[in-house]
Structure formats: C-alpha cells, structure tokens
Amino acid sequence: DCPSDWSSYDEHCYRVFQQKMNWEDAEKFCTQQHKGXHLX
C-alpha cells in the first residue's frame, strides 16, 4: 500500500512534489519522504 497522497502504478508508489531542486537534493528529499523511496 502507498502512503496517503501517493499514487500507485505497477506495484510502485509515486508522488509529485512542486519544490524545485537539483538532482542530488531531490534524491535526498525523496529518500526522506518514505522508506525505500528514490527519485524516479
């Protein structure tokens, strides 16, 4: 199951964030949002 405010697709969870940041900061931010999360 995906966290609230996340979408499920092909057994994975996705969420769009509106904050603009570089790839490194975005990956760090993403991994902090949910265990096992990575920037796609």
Curated annotation (Swiss-Prot):
Q: Per the record's keyword annotation, is Aminoacyl-tRNA synthetase included, yes or no?
A: no
Native organism is Protobothrops tokarensis
InterPro entries (UniProt xref): C-type_lectin-like/link_sf (IPR016186), CTDL_fold (IPR016187)
Q: What protein name applies here?
A: Snaclec tokaracetin subunit beta
Q: Which domain of life is it from?
A: Eukaryota
What molecular function does GO assign, one term? toxin activity
Q: Which UniProt keywords apply?
A: Disulfide bond, Hemostasis impairing toxin, Platelet aggregation inhibiting toxin, Secreted, Toxin
Q: Please give the family membership noted in the entry.
A: Belongs to the snaclec family.
Q: Provide the disulphide bond pattern.
A: 2-13
Q: Name one GO cellular component term.
A: extracellular region
Q: In which tissues is it expressed?
A: Expressed by the venom gland.
